[in-house]
Every structure is written in structure tokens, then in C-alpha cells.
């Protein structure tokens, strides 16, 4: 079956009638079975496109959570539904509230640093990752560690670049709102 034929079938009246019945069962099965075979660089874009489609179709654009059971909640991020396990019940196979917190923080720092470098006419690749040190006994995050990876082509003063990256990271509203210790590491590649 060629791609043109599949696209033609997708636009047919039969597909429009069958899709609401089949898609809820077929899409998860197809993703489970075939996602691993999509090349990694294409997989990232594919997943991002799916999420963008889901979010763009949601009317409410709200962020909310619904308690399900011990350590489990159904999260709604602008139409994207996520089964989440958190706290002492967190498992790597599920996205935890802590994962979403860190993703938001890393995204915010990444954008703040990227905009700062761009405003200073520095073209760079920026990636940010993070982890937390938490205490269930104290019921809080004790420390957040953020690693800011910066790759710049060309000759630039490394100390000046590090200083600029750290200055840019201070423009992140999320990190400015956190009361625990935040360690920011700049890694020049």
C-alpha cells in the first residue's frame, strides 16, 4: 500500500465514519507496536506533532488534575490527558507531577537563556535538564539542580558566555518563584 493511497483513504467518507469507532483502539496499539521503529530524530518531531494536535483541539485550554487512587491522578494539560503517579508511588513508566514540574522549569530556563543569547547576537544550541533532591520526611523539595548545556560555533569568551547564560537564567519566572536551593551548572560543549 503506498502513502498516496492511504492519504486518499483517510479523506474518504467511510474513514470519517469508521475513525471514531476504530481510533481509540487502533492508535494506542499502533503506537505501542511501531513507535520504536521510527528513527529517533523523526520520533521526537512525530510525538511533538501529536501533542500539538491534541492541545490545539481542546476548547478549554485548562490545566487541572483529578484524583484517581493512591498516588495516582489524571492530569489535563490543555487537553493532553496524562495518567500520573507521584510521591512514594512514582514509577519510571509514568509521568509524575515532579517530572512535569522539572519539565516546566527546564523549559522556562531554556527559553530565558535562549532569548538572552539571541538578544546578544549569539547563535547557540541550548539544552537544559534537571533533577531534584527531595525529602518525603520533610514533605518538600530540598534542592533543584539545573544543567544548562550550551553549544556555540565560533570563538567566544567562555567566562563571558557562562556569565551571560546565568544572567539569562534569572529571567525564568518559575525558578524565581521557588524557595528551595537552586544549583545552576553551565556546561559549554
Curated annotation (Swiss-Prot):
Pfam families: OsmC. It comes from the Archaea. Transmembrane segments: none annotated. SUPFAM superfamilies: OsmC-like (SSF82784). The lineage of its organism: Archaea, Methanobacteriati, Methanobacteriota, Methanomada group, Methanococci. This is Uncharacterized protein MJ0573. Belongs to the OsmC/Ohr family. InterPro entries: KH_dom-like_a/b, OsmC/Ohr_fam, OsmC/Ohrsf.
Amino acid at each position: 500500500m503506498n502513502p498516496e493511497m492511504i492519504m486518499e483513504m483517510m479523506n474518504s467518507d467511510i474513514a470519517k465514519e469508521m475513525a471514531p469507532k476504530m481510533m481509540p483502539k487502533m492508535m494506542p496499539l499502533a503506537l505501542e507496536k511501531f513507535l520504536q521503529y521510527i528513527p529517533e530524530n523523526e520520533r521526537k518531531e512525530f510525538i511533538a506533532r501529536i501533542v500539538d494536535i491534541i492541545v490545539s483541539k481542546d476548547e478549554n485550554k485548562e490545566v487541572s488534575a483529578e484524583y484517581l487512587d493512591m498516588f495516582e491522578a489524571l492530569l489535563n494539560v490543555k487537553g493532553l490527558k496524562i495518567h500520573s503517579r507521584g510521591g512514594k508511588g512514582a514509577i519510571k513508566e509514568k509521568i509524575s507531577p515532579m517530572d512535569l514540574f522539572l519539565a516546566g522549569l527546564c523549559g522556562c530556563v531554556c527559553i530565558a537563556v535562549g532569548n538572552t543569547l539571541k538578544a546578544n547576537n549569539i547563535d547557540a544550541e541550548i539544552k537544559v535538564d534537571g533533577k531534584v533532591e527531595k525529602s518525603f520526611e520533610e514533605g518538600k523539595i530540598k534542592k533543584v539542580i539545573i544543567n544548562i548545556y550550551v553549544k556555540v560555533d565560533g570563538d567566544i569568551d567562555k567566562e563571558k558566555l557562562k556569565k551571560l547564560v546565568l544572567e539569562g537564567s534569572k529571567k525564568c519566572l518559575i525558578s524565581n518563584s521557588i524557595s528551595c536551593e537552586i544549583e545552576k551548572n553551565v556546561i559549554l560543549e
